[in-house]
């Protein structure tokens, strides 16, 4: 089994905090999620998280005008220069302070960051290699409080900065003679956003109390004059012109510009002047909501403003005409962005973790996604590996598509936290348990709750399991220590299993038999035979409280995680322990900021809380109260690999040792909330609360893994963590993993065999090299008529390799029919031999089924749409023929008009209709 799993995608979290950005083509939204960045492709309906992470939560993202580079800045002031083309980090930089916003100039040559009460302009990194990608050009002083927002003119000559001191500052990007800085007032609250007009120095400023000021400049952008150098600077410029090798030194030299709110009279003569044209108020009706975010589209003069109540307004400037107003959320709108065409508007709500894209002309949603409000607790893969269902403490059950990364259905029937989720064997029914005392079954065809199972006395369910046939549903109680068994078809309670003396922590059915394993805090695991009248079969005694239990896919082994950080393996037939793993040293727990003891002593109370066997049963995945997920080899009982699921220092218990410089006689300085002034007052957290709402918007959640599952295909695994739903998958592009390689197998020999039309030998050598492009070249060189001959001569060992390659190729290749022919011939000619090894081949077959099913779903929609259109065309033609027979005296113009109408109804009205659609 391969262990080269890498981070693939982040689901369950669509927006945390920070600014949203549209890509230059306007089809994708870049959203910060924790310490990562996710790109939502709205055109292709797909989300993808970049394989990089910052040290703290992302605070702001700046996108270059060409869309190739992005600057990602976290809460600690660390910046990453990221290439969005190759999805890799190019440069690290530390701004030595908290950065509020970052913005590239429209020409892409410079960018400005607002840090503290200053603004700094840097030379943007170019296309050539540089030792220092960020070179400081100028530092602008002037505001007395924190700077909040930036906007550039279209020609990149000037930029405007808003501040919390209620002032707006216009700075020149160059040393202009008539504009170095200009301070504007007129507001009574902090500036939220400021924007320049298109091809003008006129600007708009918006404050937090809902006031818009329009400022007119008496000078056009072309009227700005460069200040001639004098004194030693003129001599320096002359020397640099003579010496070509020192040409770039002036650009590396930092310049400081200090602005004054009330400059002297002699400084105003011959300078640019601003005057206020108008002042508008958003809160006219007495609904005094704070303005929290704004965006302005310069070409269409469209202003979008978001408020703390979840309402947004669309205005047309400069007349300030209200286009429409809408409430999209119950929480404050944290960020607003408009795409390049001005059609789509993106909203981010940090309170609920919502991301919405609104098309204002048609008044419809392009994207509407929301993660779990509280932490996710449980997850389960569908049998084909295409869907993932998650349950959270917020009582919601969400179903995610692993291919697109989007949630397509949310069930809200539970009134309390969800504790367990599972799929039935068919993959169309989801069964969940909750603390509200119900177990519910949801239908994924009609998206409804069709069964609700309850107990005779109200109880809180902590776990749920469904047998292989999907007929028996069982759930464990947390307070009555009982296990309830229901029938899926009738919904009736079949039996109540008693015997445990502590809360039930886990349930699992044997995949091959109707045997139920239950783990409890009473230090036992009990095996129950569902077809036996006495029910109980065996009792396995443990050395500590049981926290998780799982069966191997073939049902021949049972794994149990206990409170003393051990994983024990049992033979369920003979009730004999076959092995154990000591995992305390592999957890590597951290020290929380409120802990009075060291991480070494705190590790005695930490353990694995989630277990899952791999698809082949040779290894087991374990995670729990730690930032690490471990893969153990079951037979050898050794650690194979350990994955660090997060490096986000904004979470608690990430580091083993606390920072001694923050430890004082009054306590830890890290516990003081630095951002408390940004919200309305300070919310005090409830004492003793470990998860949930915490009563405070400012808290550091503890890093932990609540659930783990391997995909049935065996190529990826998922984990529900404090960060969200993380998916790790095998990346074969960067891994050279040959199979039975010797010195005679080279790419040259493969191509030589192809030239000699020895296709079987070429395919075998390509499979031994295990290079995907070489295998693709060898398979696609086989003529269609010789596929059956080549497949019949392949050894059985290599048939599995070809099937695995075909399953992965279905996701990216356009040769659908060709690869389907290969799959059909392989399964028909080698089906009987493959059936004898069904257990080991099951992940490959499920991976193949998942890939083919996706193509079937896509093509069936298109074919159904064409089929219905053809039926409609036939019905219209029959109706027109009947009309002609009844009214033969109709004119030719009427007949042509009726034909045109029918064609327009079908969406094929010729060139004129296409021009109308384009217009």
UniProtKB/Swiss-Prot annotation:
Query: Does the entry feature the keyword Phosphoprotein, yes or no?
Result: yes
Q: Give residue numbers for the modification (Phosphoserine).
A: 898, 902
Q: Where is the composition biased (Basic and acidic residues)?
A: 252-267
InterPro entries per UniProt: G-protein_beta_WD-40_rep (IPR020472), PWP2 (IPR027145), Quinoprotein_ADH-like_sf (IPR011047), SSU_processome_Utp12 (IPR007148), WD40/YVTN_repeat-like_dom_sf (IPR015943), WD40_repeat_CS (IPR019775), WD40_rpt (IPR001680)
Record-linked CDD domains: WD40 (cd00200)
Where mainly located?
Answer: nucleus
Provide one Gene Ontology biological process annotation.
maturation of SSU-rRNA from tricistronic rRNA transcript (SSU-rRNA, 5.8S rRNA, LSU-rRNA)
Q: Where are the WD repeats?
A: 12-50, 53-93, 94-132, 142-181, 186-225, 286-325, 328-368, 371-410, 413-452, 456-498, 499-538, 541-580, 603-642, 700-740
Q: Which GO terms describe its molecular function?
A: RNA binding
Q: Where in the sequence does UniProt note compositional bias of the Acidic residues kind?
A: 240-251, 890-900
Q: Any idea what this protein is called?
A: Periodic tryptophan protein 2 homolog
